[in-house]
Amino acid sequence: MPNTTTPNTALQTVCLTFYIHENQQHHHTLLYEWLLEQAKKNGIWGGSAFRAIASFGRHGQLQEDHFFELGGNLTIQVIFFVQEAEAALLLDLVERENIVLFYTRTPVDSGYTSPHH
C-alpha cells in the first residue's frame, strides 16, 4: 500500500503527554479539564484525556479501577499533537502555575490518509 503522506505534506509535530491523577485539581477544577481548557484558550487545535484502568508510578503503588470508587486516583493522560512552539507554550503555562507534572514529549510525523480532509 503506498504511503499517502509524503515528506512534503507530513506535519512535523510532537506528541506532548501529561500524566495527571484523576482527582488532581487546580483552581477548584479537575486538572485535566483545566489543562484542556487552557490549551483551547491558547489556540491549540485539539487535545484528549484518557483514563487508565490500572496504573502504578514511581512509588510502586498499584491503583486499579473499582466500581465502588468515586473520584479515584488513577492516571489520566492528556495528549496533544502540536508544533514544538505550542508544546513549549503549554509547558511554560504549567510551570507558571507552579503545577508539578510528569510529561513526555516525543517527535512524531503526522498527516492525513486522504487529501480531502
Summary of predicted features, one role per range:
Residues 1-117:
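Positively charged, small/polar-rich N-terminal and surface patches that mediate targeting and assembly
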